[in-house]
Every structure is written in C-alpha cells, then in structure tokens.
Amino acid sequence: AIGLLCGLILSKIKNCKDIVIVEPNDKRLKESLKFLDADGFKPDSKNIINDQFGIVFDTVGLEVTRQQAIRCVKPGGIIIHIGLTQPSGDFDFRKTTLQEITIIGTYCYTNKDFEKTLSILNHREIGKLDWIEYRNLKEGSSAFKEIHNGTCSAPKIILLI
C-alpha cells in the first residue's frame, strides 16, 4: 500500500508522469492499476531495465528490492528507501559511488507532514480510497496468509477491532 500511496501522491498531487509500479502479486498489481494511471510490472519483467528511472521508491525493503532499485536507477538518480522488511544485505556501493546516486532514507514525519497527509486523504485529493479493504481482527491471520500466498488482491488491509 505504501507504493500505491506514493504513486497516487506523485501522480495526483505532484503531477508526475511516466510512473511505474512493481508488484509480484498479479492480483494486487491489477487492483492497484485500477486507481493509478501507471505502467505496472512484476519484478522479473524485461520491461524494467538497468539505468531506467530518475527516482526509485523502495517501499518494501527486501535485499532483492534494494538491489533492483540500485540496478534500475539512472546515473545521478535518487533512491528513496522507505521499506524496512530486511535489516541488511548486499549493497552495490561501487555503482552508487561511480554513478553519483543519492540514497534517501525516510521513516518518521513531522506533525506538519502528518496533518498535510490527513488533509490530502480527507479531501480525496488522491481519489477514493476504495483500494483499502477492511476485515475483522479475527481474520488477520488469514489476511496475512492470502498476502503471502499471492491470493489477496487488496493493496491495503486494515484490521478492525
């Protein structure tokens, strides 16, 4: 959901064009593209080539997604690292140094950032939030299994008490 949210903000608030979203789950990818005017591919797609993008958001944070971000960012480009799934792994310092790639880690936000985000969501500046699915807390285990197994199409699930 963080990747979709980043894409929606870039598209609808920042008026960015040529957005590409990468998602391994075909169902989630198809569902996300209903809400975002973007190209969508699986991570192993031949459409994702090296040195292709000026800015890359890694919203997952696995070693494999970090490596893909480094491979596909253009020389002089920027990688914004948000995801925290895996704490460590291999890192191509040579490419990032020789090609002067900027890496920005982001985790926390200011109260002003939080207020702005709530305003964007409340005023539907990024469209309806129909991509969010709500389930009871007792369905949490099955929701995680569906996400893991690739059978869940919802980009975001919120568990309700």
Regions found by a protein language model. Name each.
Residues 47-56:
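A short acidic, Gly/Pro-enriched loop at the edge of an enzyme's catalytic core
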Residues 67, 111, 115-161:
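C-terminal hydrophobic helical "lid"/dimerization subdomain
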Residues 57-59, 161:
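Short, well-ordered coil/turn residues at beta-beta hairpins
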Residues 1-43:
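Mid-domain Rossmann-like dinucleotide-binding core that forms the NAD(H)/NADP(H) cofactor-binding site
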Residues 38-45, 134-139:
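Short acidic-hydrophobic, aromatic-tinged amphipathic segments that line or gate anion-handling sites
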Residues 14, 61, 74-75, 152:
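Short conserved AdoMet
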Residues 64-123, 160-161:
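Glycine-rich phosphate-binding loop and adjacent beta-alpha segment
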Residues 22-24, 59, 107:
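N-terminal Rossmann-fold cofactor-binding loop
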